[in-house]
Amino acid sequence: MSDMHITLKVWRQDGPEQKGRFEEYAAIAAPDMSFLEMLDVVNDGLEEGHKIPVSFDSDCREGICGMCGLVINGVPHGPGKGTTTCQLYMRSFADGDTITIEPFRATAFPVIRDLVVDRTAFDQIVQAGGYNSVNTGSAPDANAVLVSKDRAEE
């Protein structure tokens, strides 16, 4: 699989009281990279250029904790139905795509910096046990990504 050349339009905001703006970045990503791995690579490039990296949250990177919530091309968590941002892979996009990345925008989740929001309201619901009201069955295996035989033998 060849690398993809992607243009990112990323929401940047220096602080909760600051005005935000979109900034564009060029990214090169492998199709089997997760979306957050691609953001890590972009941040590595920004740091090498002595620029401030894009702030974003992630914790488990296994689709469990919900810390990685972003709005991608206007859709919460991106184009993958029933998936979290950390379980979204670059193969969901095409070479040459422009991807817009924003934080969740809701009064309950004020922006702290860039793509990081204050999750206090959500965390209080989770701590009270109020978010888990439906039996959804067993959880899918974390990070279950099929790898082709040819790729596995490389």
Segments and roles (model prediction):
Residues 1-153:
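Signature of N-terminal electron-transfer/Fe-S-associated modules in redox systems
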